[in-house]
């Protein structure tokens, strides 16, 4: 035991005895190999760090092979460095294969950066969502209909990637659908998985459009299997439907100067054109009900008389209850400027500032 300890101590504390040192240094290939190795071991993490690591170590070990073959003349040096060079090349090939497999088409890559990356959706989860739509991008020509009211069945969920889609009912324009908005989110939420239904609106492409579509059955299976994806779609669909409701509310404000409760079930009839002499009595009754709701607010301005500071107010004095302040109008989208001009918006805001209008008509026409 003592002999082994003494031999280890000699190896550690006594320098190796060299019979003779080389009078000259190694060749340029040897120093080039060490430079490659030094730069390679300074690589970072991640996929690109691995590309850098094995891309630099491979040439470094190859230079060691050349040095061992031409200068050192050692078979063991050549064999070990050949093995290390092959290992680096295999790692590079495996990295290239993984990158090619995980690469998405340009449309889906842009969709991920726009819609899912701000929500910190993992890329693997996004790939499952894309795989559910078979990674297909569908197109619509100008004035081509995506759905016809009363005819097209609700059997899919689609997301617009580019272009603009017009939504109408009975020929009456309702709102637009812009890129990265769902095209049929209200229809999707209106049905249970076991129910069948048809579109109540017509969707027409105003420009050349591209979109992706999930089959209804496949998407329901994915949502039932993956709870995270189900919550993600619930949040996205809820936000999309609220945006559509606010778009309708903005159009009402541009037309009447009023902001109605978005929970009303008959906004479509309020959006219909003004009643004329030749229209049916039902539409005239709708207009009269709307005027009856607006006229009291405009005929009774709010006036508060200040009370002298010395006299105490009587016990039975009823102070006027302030009405809720109307919300400021939402800014229209860049492509939907023709929904309302700036002049009606300004006039409507002045009317709202002078007299507070009710949130909704008193008598709402039924569908």
Swiss-Prot record:
Keyword Transmembrane: yes
Compositional bias of kind Acidic residues: 278-290
Modified residues (Phosphothreonine): 364
Intracellular or extracellular location(s): Membrane; Cell membrane, Sarcolemma
Keywords, ordered alphabetically: cAMP, cAMP-binding, Cell membrane, Glycoprotein, Membrane, Nucleotide-binding, Phosphoprotein, Transmembrane, Transmembrane helix
Keyword Kinase listed: no
Protein role: Important for the maintenance of cardiac function. Plays a regulatory function in heart rate dynamics mediated, at least in part, through cAMP-binding and, probably, by increasing cell surface expression of the potassium channel KCNK2 and enhancing current density.
Entry similarity comment: Belongs to the popeye family.
Protein name: Popeye domain-containing protein 2
Organism per entry: Mus musculus
């Amino acid at each position: 035991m003592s002999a082994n300890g003494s031999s280890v101590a000699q190896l550690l504390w006594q320098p190796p005895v060299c019979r003779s040192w080389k009078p000259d240094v190694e060749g340029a290939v040897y120093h080039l190999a060490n430079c490659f190795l030094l730069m390679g071991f300074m690589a970072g993490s991640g996929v690109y760090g691995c590309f850098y690591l094995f891309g630099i170590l491979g040439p470094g070990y190859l230079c060691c092979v050349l040095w061992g073959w031409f200068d050192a003349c050692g078979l063991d040096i050549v064999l070990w460095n050949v093995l290390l060079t092959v290992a680096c090349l295999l790692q590079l090939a495996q990295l290239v294969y993984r990158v090619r497999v995980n690469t998405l088409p340009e449309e889906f890559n842009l969709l991920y950066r726009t819609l899912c990356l701000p929500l910190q959706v993992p890329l693997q989860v996004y790939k499952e969502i894309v795989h559910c739509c078979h990674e297909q991008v569908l197109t619509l020509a100008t004035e081509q209909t995506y759905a016809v009211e009363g005819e097209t069945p609700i059997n899919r969920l689609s997301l617009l990637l580019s272009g603009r889609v017009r939504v109408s009912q009975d020929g009456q324009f309702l709102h637009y659908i812009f890129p990265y908005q769902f095209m049929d989110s209200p229809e999707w939420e209106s049905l249970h998985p076991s129910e069948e239904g048809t579109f109540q609106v017509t969707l027409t492409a105003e420009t050349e459009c591209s979109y992706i579509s999930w089959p209804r059955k496949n998407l329901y299976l994915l949502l039932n299997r993956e709870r995270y994806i189900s919550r993600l779609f619930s949040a996205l669909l809820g936000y999309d439907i609220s945006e559509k409701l606010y778009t309708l509310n903005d159009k009402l404000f541009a037309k009447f100067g009023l902001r109605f409760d978005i929970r009303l079930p008959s906004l479509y009839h309020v959006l219909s054109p003004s009643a004329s002499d030749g229209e049916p009595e039902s539409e005239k009754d709708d207009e009269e009900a709307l005027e009856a709701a607006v006229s009291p607010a405009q005929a009774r301005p709010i006036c508060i008389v200040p009370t002298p500071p010395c006299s105490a107010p009587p016990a039975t004095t009823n102070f006027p209850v302030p009405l809720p302040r109307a919300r400021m109008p939402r800014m229209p989208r860049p492509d939907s400027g023709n929904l309302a001009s700036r002049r009606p918006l300004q006039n409507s805001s002045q009317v709202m500032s002078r007299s507070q209008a009710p949130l909704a008509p008193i008598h709402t026409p039924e569908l």
